[in-house]
Amino acid sequence: MIIRSPEPEVKIVVDRDPIKTSFEAWARPGHFSRTIAKGPDTTTWIWNLHADAHDFDSHTSDLEEISRKVFSAHFGQLSIIFLWLSGMYFHGARFSNYEAWLSDPTHIRPSAQVVWPIVGQEILNGDVGGGFRGIQITSGFFQIWRASGITSELQLYCTAIGALVFAALMLFAGWFHYHKAAPKLAWFQDVESMLNHHLAGLLGLGSLSWAGHQIHVSLPINQFLDAGVDPKEIPLPHEFILNRDLLAQLYPSFAEGATPFFTLNWSKYAEFLTFRGGLDPITGGLWLSDIAHHHLAIAILFLIAGHMYRTNWGIGHGLKDILEAHKGPFTGQGHKGLYEILTTSWHAQLALNLAMLGSLTIVVAHHMYSMPPYPYLATDYGTQLSLFTHHMWIGGFLIVGAAAHAAIFMVRDYDPTTRYNDLLDRVLRHRDAIISHLNWACIFLGFHSFGLYIHNDTMSALGRPQDMFSDTAIQLQPIFAQWVQNTHALAPVATAPGATTGTSLAWGGGELVAVGGKVALLPIPLGTADFLVHHIHAFTIHVTVLILLKGVLFARSSRLIPDKANLGFRFPCDGPGRGGTCQVSAWDHVFLGLFWMYNSISVVIFHFSWKMQSDVWGSISDQGVVTHITGGNFAQSSITINGWLRDFLWAQASQVIQSYGSSLSAYGLFFLGAHFVWAFSLMFLFSGRGYWQELIESIVWAHNKLKVAPATQPRALSIVQGRAVGVTHYLLGGIATTWAFFLARIIAVG
């Protein structure tokens, strides 16, 4: 038994009026840095200003002040998010065909952007059905609005105004908690209280209120919409909330109120809290009653979780105790010291959060198509493709960000004198073994995955199809993936006796779901083609991890540069006279990691786009015959590199290349322009700084001759600045090219 002295009561502490509100600093660019505040001598000044403006660590070493700045900045971020959301809702209210779409979501396509005729751009306003002309949107907002029970554009206006009010409130909060009542450091470090409030408040009460909204507002309104009732005839949300009889007409058990809850007769509520599984055949989305049930269950879990941590009352878990008890037989001190790291280094904390949030975002991408949550989402192929692509990119960026901040933690916040024989120290001590093994795995995966394709290209070129790896010749079936699919398809009767259908139709087993003559989802077959491309996924992901992990583990020191920590997070080379030491900073690893992240995600979204068009998406005839968009060509075409180039990139680019003169022509222009942005990046990535400095000198000479030379000396970009500009344009150009290619294609054929 552990006997503890009574814990001191947690006091909520703030400093009153710590920093005077003043706009004077705004008039002094770079006021946060003594060097930058002096003003520009050379053009490098503007780059340093942007690089350091939000690097709060470089402004002060006072952790409390840094914490307050970060906290305040978060409110600013939330304000921008509310402003953006308000804009989305305002467009839905002012420029959209939402009410028309609501009346016929299978034939009318969503649009919430109408182009003004200035020099002929009105060609972009395509006919989306129902007599409306505008740009087809693929964000999924219409589907979310229908699911949440919004039936008129007036409601969208009101929500837009509400979001503006919240944006203003967030701006105020950011000012208030920095200038008027700024929390002390102890408040930011009180993890138990933070966990309780975030778990019970944000996630618990948040889910509970959403479940309440879904039960009292969404479910009845969607019942009426599904039955074909005119949206204008449906009672308004507050009528359902205030008038129980209205709900009781749809769900008789509502008449009994909360009695079944308190008498533990919960099965009464099974009318609107269901456990069906599968998709609603009318809308092609998950059953709304399943979703409400899910949020209620999640709310209860998080409300319990939000009461688990020890604060003012001496009961519950302490994070420090949990971490320090975390010792294995082979892990030395285990997690001892991790608590101190995570409460004093916000970079370490952020790295963990970004890694988890990035992984979660990628999980979301995969669930949006396999378990489409909103009505009429599954048959809106443009939106499905956009949501998958968007969440994959975001997840990739967040994971690279995790490595970036882990490396910054290693350089700025890691104290090797206090860390001995804990898990982090042990990982660092055998980093050579980790990195060399990971490198071997990358080489193995690269040669073998690519080698299978090269073999197929060669056999195909030599006219020997019988010697190729394919479903019709030498089969390489993904037996483990098929086993996972099959296990889940059989679950409803076996391991999940309460469920009537599997979690996702993609597992197999069920009949396909079609809405309005279009396939929503069907069992997705996996074969040799998927086996091949999945090993390319394994390869690209492992290389990305290799680069990023090497950057973190060698951020402070390496055999090549033992004193790397003294050089900082980003530096070009280890000074003159030391050749071969460029591109070794932790920043450079993030820079290189971004390119491989881009490789990884590109292959994933290409695979998804082609696989869905080939094997899932398509139309269904009255006789039940399914015609897929690309007629099932994935299995035979994607097993060679040539097939990817010819039958995916080239064949499916025809829509964007031929879009001129049509309502899709903006995508054609973006396709061209984004290629240009991408190519522009190469000028920065393949350039020598000296080349540009020489050029600048002669241009300055000409300006001096004409007596028009500026006072600020022009300088070529530093090596790091050039790389930053290069990778930004590379990713921006590449992503925008893909976006134009995907959307022109899927809007034309989907």
UniProtKB/Swiss-Prot annotation:
It catalyses: reduced [plastocyanin] + hnu + oxidized [2Fe-2S]-[ferredoxin] = oxidized [plastocyanin] + reduced [2Fe-2S]-[ferredoxin]. Gene3D superfamilies: Photosystem I PsaA/PsaB. The keyword Cell membrane does not apply. [4Fe-4S] cluster binds at C573, C582. Its EC number is 1.97.1.12. PROSITE patterns: PHOTOSYSTEM_I_PSAAB. One of its GO terms (biological process) is photosynthesis. It is found in: Plastid, Chloroplast thylakoid membrane. Chlorophyll a binds at M683, Y691. Its main location: plastid. P700 is a chlorophyll a/chlorophyll a' dimer, A0 is one or more chlorophyll a, A1 is one or both phylloquinones and FX is a shared 4Fe-4S iron-sulfur center. The chain crosses the membrane at residues 70-93, 156-179, 195-219, 291-309, 346-369, 385-411, 433-455, 531-549, 589-610, 664-686, 724-744. PsaA and PsaB bind P700, the primary electron donor of photosystem I (PSI), as well as the electron acceptors A0, A1 and FX. PSI is a plastocyanin-ferredoxin oxidoreductase, converting photonic excitation into a charge separation, which transfers an electron from the donor P700 chlorophyll pair to the spectroscopically characterized acceptors A0, A1, FX, FA and FB in turn. Oxidized P700 is reduced on the lumenal side of the thylakoid membrane by plastocyanin. This is Photosystem I P700 chlorophyll a apoprotein A1. The lineage of its organism: Eukaryota, Viridiplantae, Streptophyta, Embryophyta, Tracheophyta.
